[in-house]
Amino acid sequence: MANTDRPALPHKRAVPPSRADSGPRRRRTKLLDAVAGFGVTLGSMFKKTVTEEYPERPGPVAARYHGRHQLNRYPDGLEKCIGCELCAWACPADAIYVEGADNTEEERFSPGERYGRVYQINYLRCIGCGLCIEACPTRALTMTYDYELADDNRADLIYEKDRLLAPLLPEMAAPPHPRTPGATDKDYYLGNVTAEGLRGVRESQTTGDSR
């Protein structure tokens, strides 16, 4: 039998919306919110654009930017790399692989005793730190401003020597070829060798001709 002594719970009546939340005032508020949202768009339309037209117009890079590596040449075309492997030892990411070989008088690629026969840089590992540049004793390895290294094939991101060597200038001869007559590997290192020949020899010849 049901207990009829319990007091009945008060009935909750739904609170009708106030007249302030409906009608013209509410519609005016919604309209102002929409206009405020478009105000941000309209205000940005007349500002200077920050979009860069890449890749049609590549943006500038910093003066000391660490981009793709380059194996440099001497002015006569011989390679600066001597295959010492110091760059590979200095690399913290183990991204460089070098195999050195001996030069001969019949087949000379660099002024010294050895040259880099195999040179690879794995750009899947390279972190662009530049420690390899600091370790190079002949300034053979530098970093360019080229930053477009993305590819859809992992194998193509392992750069071989032919892709790293600096292009031959018109006055250079493609190695292998003999050293400049009268020049030693020290003359090459000190920058005394030019595309025309050994600087000291050329200057003395010019002085003798003038006499």
Curated annotation (Swiss-Prot):
Binding site for [4Fe-4S] cluster 2: 91, 126, 129, 132
Membrane topology annotation: Peripheral membrane protein
Gene3D superfamilies the UniProt entry points to: 3.30.70.3270
Catalysed reaction equations from the record: a quinone + NADH + 5 H(+)(in) = a quinol + NAD(+) + 4 H(+)(out)
Chain sites annotated for binding [4Fe-4S] cluster 1: 81, 84, 87, 136
Record-linked InterPro entries: 4Fe4S_Fe-S-bd, 4Fe4S_Fe_S_CS, NADH_quinone_OxRdtase_chainI
Keyword 4Fe-4S attributed: yes
Residues covered by region (Disordered): 1-27
Keyword Metal-binding set for record: yes
EC number(s) on file: 7.1.1.-
GO molecular function: 4 iron, 4 sulfur cluster binding; iron ion binding; NADH:ubiquinone reductase (non-electrogenic) activity; quinone binding
SUPFAM superfamilies assigned to the protein according to its UniProt record, in alphabetical order: 4Fe-4S ferredoxins
GO cellular component: cytosol; peptidoglycan-based cell wall; plasma membrane
Single Gene Ontology BP annotation: aerobic respiration
Family, per entry: Belongs to the complex I 23 kDa subunit family.
Function in brief: NDH-1 shuttles electrons from NADH, via FMN and iron-sulfur (Fe-S) centers, to quinones in the respiratory chain. The immediate electron acceptor for the enzyme in this species is believed to be menaquinone. Couples the redox reaction to proton translocation (for every two electrons transferred, four hydrogen ions are translocated across the cytoplasmic membrane), and thus conserves the redox energy in a proton gradient.
Oligomer and partners: NDH-1 is composed of 14 different subunits. Subunits NuoA, H, J, K, L, M, N constitute the membrane sector of the complex.
Record protein name field: NADH-quinone oxidoreductase subunit I
Organism for this UniProt entry: Mycobacterium tuberculosis (strain ATCC 25618 / H37Rv)
Underlying gene: nuoI
